[in-house]
């Protein structure tokens, strides 16, 4: 009996509507009658186009401090009516990026950051990151132990030179 009274006072259930994109899932009025997946992809597209428009707008801003002679046209004059929005997506290139990095620094082979560079021991979170860019275990963390290529002395000299500039006094005039 209680359930009969409850059904008569509650609102009648509405039938769920299918997604407006026709993917077969049920849509929600809060998501513009789209399913969660279609709504997420729609929002991602909107965000991407907004970012692209902002990037185009920022790239087309003219420098405010340029000096142009009277009667001379600006070389970068662009009419906004002819602009089109172009969405650029990153595509994988045919040239591997790791090969370009190896050419720049051939002295050190590439190793994962969770292993010691000297003994190849797993260090996990407890690894010590050196200023030379490698990760080391507890026994190889000191520069003397792993033959560090970073020049600490030169960095120290530069820091002292920047902190203490050379002060020259004026010549003393003799009486």
From Swiss-Prot:
Species of origin reads: Arabidopsis thaliana
Query: Highest lineage ranks of the organism?
Result: Eukaryota, Viridiplantae, Streptophyta, Embryophyta, Tracheophyta
ZnF start-end (AN1-type):
110-156
Which branch of life, at top level? Eukaryota
Q: Where are the zinc fingers (A20-type)?
A: 13-47
Q: Which PROSITE patterns match?
A: ZF_A20 (PS51036), ZF_AN1 (PS51039)
Q: Where does Zn(2+) 2 bind?
A: 116, 119, 137, 140
Question: Is Hydrolase one of the keywords?
Answer: no
Q: Keywords in UniProt for this one?
A: Metal-binding, Zinc, Zinc-finger
Task: Tell me the protein's name.
Answer: Zinc finger A20 and AN1 domain-containing stress-associated protein 7
Q: Does the keyword Thylakoid apply?
A: no
Gene Ontology cellular-component terms for this entry are: plasmodesma
Gene Ontology terms for molecular function: DNA binding; zinc ion binding
Which residues of this UniProt protein bind Zn(2+) 1?
A: 19, 23, 35, 38
Q: What PANTHER family has UniProt attached to this entry?
A: AN1-TYPE ZINC FINGER PROTEIN, ZINC FINGER A20 AND AN1 DOMAIN-CONTAINING STRESS-ASSOCIATED PROTEIN 7
Which sites bind Zn(2+) 3?
130, 132, 146, 148
State the function annotated in the UniProt record: May be involved in environmental stress response.
